[in-house]
């Protein structure tokens, strides 16, 4: 069981490699906000001509088909607020969920592991 953030999910959806292997091998848990973050990340890549429209659509369809357990963020507010000094509310949502579930957080965002705020293991995968 792992919590996966949008950066790692995007890496898995768009590239072969460590992120895809981890996501294929584990039960995935995410805060609800991940779906919007994934759609936003794909949109940004498409606007920069780094991703075609058909590839973006396929990535969204693949994400939708994955067995992912989603959690409301409202139950994580207290911990999100506690770590607000060094993490955005978005990033803190992933950390708080991983802590609550007592599992690792998988991310492609190196700075997330450098804050010293997380009380859970963090695995950084290549983008």
Curated annotation (Swiss-Prot):
CDD domains documented for this protein: PIN_Pae0151-like
Domain of life of the organism encoding this protein: Bacteria
The keyword Magnesium is annotated on this UniProt entry: yes
Cofactor section: Mg(2+)
Record EC number: 3.1.-.-
Binding-site residues for Mg(2+), renumbered to this chain: 5, 91
InterPro entries named in the record: PIN-like_dom_sf, PIN_dom, PIN_Pae0151-like, TypeII_TA_RNase_PINc/VapC, VapC_family
Record's keyword annotation contains DNA-binding: no
Pfam hit, one: PIN
Enzyme class, broadest EC rank: hydrolase
Single GO MF descriptor: RNA nuclease activity
UniProt keyword terms in alphabetical order: Hydrolase, Magnesium, Metal-binding, Nuclease, Toxin-antitoxin system
Domain called PINc: residue spans: 2-115
PANTHER family documented for this protein: EXONUCLEASE VAPC9 (PTHR35901:SF1), RIBONUCLEASE VAPC3 (PTHR35901)
Its job: Toxic component of a type II toxin-antitoxin (TA) system. An RNase.
Family: Belongs to the PINc/VapC protein family.
Protein name: VapC ribonuclease Mb0985
Protein source organism: Mycobacterium bovis (strain ATCC BAA-935 / AF2122/97)
Top-level taxonomy: Bacteria, Bacillati, Actinomycetota, Actinomycetes, Mycobacteriales
